[in-house]
Amino acid sequence: MSVDVTNETQWVIDPKVFSDLGIWVLDQMRVSTQSDLTIMFVDPDPIAELHMRWMNLEGPTDVMSFPMDELRPGDGKTVMEGVLGDIVICPWVAAQQAAAAGHSTMQEMLLLTIHGILHLLGYDHVTPEQERQMFGLQRQLLLTFFALRHDANVQATLPAGTPDALALYDAAHGAGRDLDSK
């Protein structure tokens, strides 16, 4: 199984934690070890462009998933293999959401990684029942991963003096983004 992690931001992020999380979640969901996944961390401008292009929604968002081979969780007897797809995460939006939720940016980005993987596997949260199922599963997966990997909750940080890219985006494009309108 291959989980490639790319960080195109100034955030200091340990790619191994996210690679390990991806491999572990795919194993828990019975996806073949021959499957591939890419996780990218980007600034507000690139994710805002993707958000507009693919969702026709303005502004940066926290996470977007781009499925490739439409793999689904395995039944325990057979496992699906192929290219699962790409997950794109904006640490700036994650940091804002984490502050609002009262937990660390790293916890938020790990949660968003699981959220993105579940979307790639066909989960959604359009209806209340789907939301209950998906959010319950992502919480269970995250808490279990933390229980197994105590070192997974290291902090994601920014080098001193790094300008706030989300504030710069808002200044250039107008503030007033609604984080709850995903």
From Swiss-Prot:
<dbReference type="GO" id="GO:0008270">
    <property type="term" value="F:zinc ion binding"/>
</dbReference>
<dbReference type="GO" id="GO:0005737">
    <property type="term" value="C:cytoplasm"/>
</dbReference>
<feature type="binding site">
    <location>
        <position position="119"/>
    </location>
    <ligand>
        <name>Zn(2+)</name>
    </ligand>
</feature>
<dbReference type="GO" id="GO:0004222">
    <property type="term" value="F:metalloendopeptidase activity"/>
</dbReference>
<feature type="binding site">
    <location>
        <position position="125"/>
    </location>
    <ligand>
        <name>Zn(2+)</name>
    </ligand>
</feature>
<dbReference type="Pfam" id="PF02130">
    <property type="entry name" value="YbeY"/>
</dbReference>
<keyword id="KW-0690">Ribosome biogenesis</keyword>
<comment type="function">
    <text>Single strand-specific metallo-endoribonuclease involved in late-stage 70S ribosome quality control and in maturation of the 3' terminus of the 16S rRNA.</text>
</comment>
<keyword id="KW-0378">Hydrolase</keyword>
<keyword id="KW-0479">Metal-binding</keyword>
<dbReference type="InterPro" id="IPR002036">
    <property type="entry name" value="YbeY"/>
</dbReference>
<dbReference type="InterPro" id="IPR020549">
    <property type="entry name" value="YbeY_CS"/>
</dbReference>
<dbReference type="InterPro" id="IPR023091">
    <property type="entry name" value="MetalPrtase_cat_dom_sf_prd"/>
</dbReference>
<feature type="binding site">
    <location>
        <position position="115"/>
    </location>
    <ligand>
        <name>Zn(2+)</name>
    </ligand>
</feature>
<protein>
    <recommendedName>
        <fullName>Endoribonuclease YbeY</fullName>
        <ecNumber>3.1.-.-</ecNumber>
    </recommendedName>
</protein>
<keyword id="KW-0698">rRNA processing</keyword>
<dbReference type="GO" id="GO:0006364">
    <property type="term" value="P:rRNA processing"/>
</dbReference>
<keyword id="KW-0862">Zinc</keyword>
<keyword id="KW-0255">Endonuclease</keyword>
<comment type="similarity">
    <text>Belongs to the endoribonuclease YbeY family.</text>
</comment>
<dbReference type="GO" id="GO:0004521">
    <property type="term" value="F:RNA endonuclease activity"/>
</dbReference>
<keyword id="KW-0963">Cytoplasm</keyword>
<keyword id="KW-0540">Nuclease</keyword>
